[in-house]
């Protein structure tokens, strides 16, 4: 298993500094949020891209994943749909340029117009288009189990990966998202996606006074020990999606919190 640091752990921190920290923490790579208003986006100037790639080489920390936020690949509005598919394709091409292996994708939004089947079919068509580009670039698009999408559950995500039916499109397994957002049990989430998982997001939460509270992995309700016992971890990428960006007051700083997560998972897999 290879361990990846996620820049969501370091809100507002420039990517070179994030690379340096994750290298010091003995991680195996970096997942970079690619969104306007953050330190990295897909229209970043060439000079800044070069600086990031040079830092990746200097600190021996590969860029593993780019994580853009193109929600509306299944929009009923043609122009909006094309804009989002185009953005995902641009992220794929940028990932290839930067030597990355994965691009995170949403499975379309569940708030799009149309029936459930129409929304699902448009998402599948969009991912086939992007998947062809990814196949040519040697990139894998990973569809996340994520709230607000057509792939909230493991069953939904597995169906979408099956319908796309391309080696360049796999599932991004996020048991924390599914446990909190849906009624699907953790074992179903895992087994339904068996053979389709290309990447893992690792995080945790607990319920305090009826409210969700982000926490260090191993201190919450996600059954990571049981999950890891059933996963084939040999060639797997596990990204610590330490959500300091969304929960700044609930999580300790990444410099101490991420190592605690890493230590827990390393001990769990022996």
Residue ranges and their predicted role:
Residues 1-4, 9-26, 57, 151-173, ...:
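Histidine-acidic metal/acid-base catalytic patches
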Residues 1-4, 63-74, 107-111:
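N-terminal small/glycine-rich loop or linker at the start of catalytic domains
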Residues 16-17, 55-59, 74-173, 180, ...:
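Active-site acidic/histidine proton-transfer and metal-coordination neighborhood
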Residues 31, 65-67, 104, 142, ...:
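Conserved beta-strand positions in the central sheet of alpha/beta enzyme cores
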Residues 33-53, 107-114:
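Glycine-rich, proline-tolerant flexible connector loops at the mouths of alpha/beta enzymes
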Residues 37, 73, 245-247:
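Sequence/structural signature of outer-membrane beta-barrel proteins
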Residues 39-42, 78-81, 117-118, 213-218, ...:
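Short glycine-enriched, charge-decorated loop/helix-capping segments at active-site entrances
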Residues 47-58, 126-133, 189, 226-230:
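Catalytic-core regions built around general acid/base machinery
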